[in-house]
């Protein structure tokens, strides 16, 4: 929240002799005091964010735990082990801490998987990844892997039949690694459907097990919805889309009529299009 500084200038009137009063009135008005600029807010460091997430309030934790299903949709054949990676090189979503707590709680309650958490690039190496069945990118942004060995470690991980999952901003990564962007399915290209707005969603694959929670019905939800660069979006030929924006609802489709989004209309062209929010794909032998 921006701080506003209000400066009040008080003018004092003095009684002057009659012969000087007229002359005084002709004097140029005094200059107003310059407004003092608010002090710039200190930019949070990565350690500041981590400290904030470590102090997630009990009320916030309770609300997350209340929303988590009591059991898995399907019974797992075995307990899996996942590595949750949450580093950011770009915009930092404040919800990362809540996401980490949610995943830890699901792992503990449902016992379908166990979860380890890291923000250290060095942990993305072949030897370490052998311990895991999946990598979850929790709202990571602008990830730039440090070397070819890390990139190859993820490719080998996928070739071994393992899995990668991405939450929200996972689509805002790998701008210097085309194969990584293809693995995710696309790259961020703005969010005309902004945070705080309530948007309609439809089930593109209502019978899929991951959509059972919606009981075959579309829904409205408050969230920030990404769209993806046409040149990087893998499209419906490569992606099995589970949920997308319901463009039949005027509240959703009319957003693109805003003059601010003319560049997007030029990019995507006229007519209906699919804006996915959840999908699956096979990639290099993994999923």
Where do the language-model regions lie?
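N-terminal export/membrane-targeting signals
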Residues: 1-23
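Aromatic-Pro/Gly-enriched surface loop or interdomain linker
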Residues: 22-27, 32-131
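Extracytoplasmic/secreted envelope proteins and their assembly/folding machinery
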Residues: 65, 100-104, 151-155, 177, ...
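Short, surface-exposed beta-strand/loop micro-motifs that present aromatic residues
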Residues: 70-73, 227-231, 266-268, 272-285
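Short alpha-beta junction capping motif
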Residues: 82-85, 129-175
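Short, solvent-exposed loop/turn elements at domain surfaces
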Residues: 89-95, 144, 249-253
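An acidic, glycine-rich "communication" segment
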Residues: 167-257
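Short, surface-exposed loop/helix-turn segments at secondary-structure junctions
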Residues: 252-271
């Amino acid at each position: 929240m921006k701080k506003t500084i209000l400066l009040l200038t008080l003018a004092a009137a003095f009684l002057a002799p009659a012969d000087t009063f007229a002359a005084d009135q002709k004097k140029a008005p005094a200059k107003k005091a310059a407004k003092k600029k608010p002090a710039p807010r200190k930019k949070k460091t990565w350690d500041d964010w981590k400290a904030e997430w470590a102090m997630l309030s009990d009320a916030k934790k309770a609300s997350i735990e209340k929303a988590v299903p009591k059991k898995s949709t399907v019974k797992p054949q075995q307990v899996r082990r996942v590595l949750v990676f949450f580093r950011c090189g770009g915009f930092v979503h404040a919800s990362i801490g809540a996401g980490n707590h949610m995943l830890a709680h699901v792992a503990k309650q449902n016992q379908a998987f166990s979860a380890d958490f890291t923000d250290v690039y060095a942990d993305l190496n072949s030897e370490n990844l052998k311990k895991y069945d999946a990598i979850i990118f929790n709202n990571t942004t602008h990830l730039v892997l440090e070397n070819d060995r890390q990139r190859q470690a993820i490719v080998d991980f996928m070739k071994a039949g393992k899995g990668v999952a991405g939450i929200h901003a996972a689509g805002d990564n790998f701008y210097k690694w085309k194969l990584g962007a293809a693995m995710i399915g696309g790259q961020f290209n703005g969010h005309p459907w902004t945070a705080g707005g309530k948007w309609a969603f439809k089930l593109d694959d209502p019978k899929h097990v991951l959509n059972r929670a919606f009981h075959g019905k579309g829904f409205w939800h408050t969230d920030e919805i990404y769209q993806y660069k046409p040149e990087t979006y893998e499209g419906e030929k490569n992606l099995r889309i589970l949920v997308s924006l319901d463009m039949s609802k005027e509240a959703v489709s009319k957003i693109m009529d805003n003059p601010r989004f003319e560049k997007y209309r030029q990019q995507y062209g006229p007519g209906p299009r699919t804006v996915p929010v959840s999908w699956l794909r096979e990639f290099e032998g993994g999923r």
